[in-house]
């Protein structure tokens, strides 16, 4: 049985800091982030790995083996504080060996004449955008083991492409969404672990590797806490709709015209102007007549 000690602060032990690739310091320095913690797990014993390989008839890849020899699973969480309310947000999970179980038909489909996972093979071909890669099969052609249940948003799986006996070099990491469509993630477990850490365990981050992307709600969290080395252009729902593509040289073209000043005419004198103005021409008074004066 796996032990589940109480969560510890991320920076309390040096080996935990090494395990998280230093991402804890980034989270703790981010605004609003609180309660960054890791559930410390003991290393798996070698006989546990050998027992898993014998039980499942699969050889565990070397990087997966080395991971379990360092820690029997991984669980790191962090929360955000908004308006005095603490909201759990980030979650990074790698199942321990006892939970690294094969993905098989659920008991829900065990009723007579009920559809099986194998019946979805033809339908799932439509949802696979990785046409150059052979997708996993739910039947004996592939051996699929669950690494993370993604909080009910899908499943991250370790896939042995050629079924059993499973060889270590035939493994890949795939994401199975809620519609049971497969999406390729990485060639190796090490590459996937780096993706998990650099995406900070944000909700639904695996959907960034699908054709339909993350949900609008998840985009809001991605905008607030951008994953490390994340392509921010994916946060735009429809670039053609929301990105303003105006050409400034055309918009302000009319302002670049040379204005020709108009010529001004002579200034007319103002009647109320102070100071000496132009002299009016003299006016002659009418005379009574010429020659002798008139007698009464």
Swiss-Prot record:
Q: What is its main location?
A: cytoplasm
Family matches, as InterPro entries: Knr4/Smi1-like_dom (IPR018958), Knr4/Smi1-like_sf (IPR037883), TPGS2 (IPR039231)
Record keywords, A-Z: Cytoplasm, Cytoskeleton, Microtubule
An annotated GO cellular component of this protein is:
cytoplasm
Keyword Electron transport in record: no
Enumerate the residue ranges of region (Disordered): 257-296
Q: Where in the cell is it found?
A: Cytoplasm, Cytoskeleton; Cytoplasm, Cytoskeleton, Microtubule organizing center, Centrosome, Centriolar satellite
**Spans traversing the lipid bilayer:** none
> What's the superkingdom here?
Eukaryota
Q: Self-association or partners: how does it assemble?
A: Part of the neuronal tubulin polyglutamylase complex which contains TPGS1, TPGS2, TTLL1, LRRC49 and NICN1. Interacts with CSTPP1 and LRRC49.
Chain's role: Subunit of the tubulin polyglutamylase complex (TPGC). The complex mediates cilia and flagella polyglutamylation which is essential for their biogenesis and motility.
Protein name (database record): Tubulin polyglutamylase complex subunit 2
Native organism: Rattus norvegicus
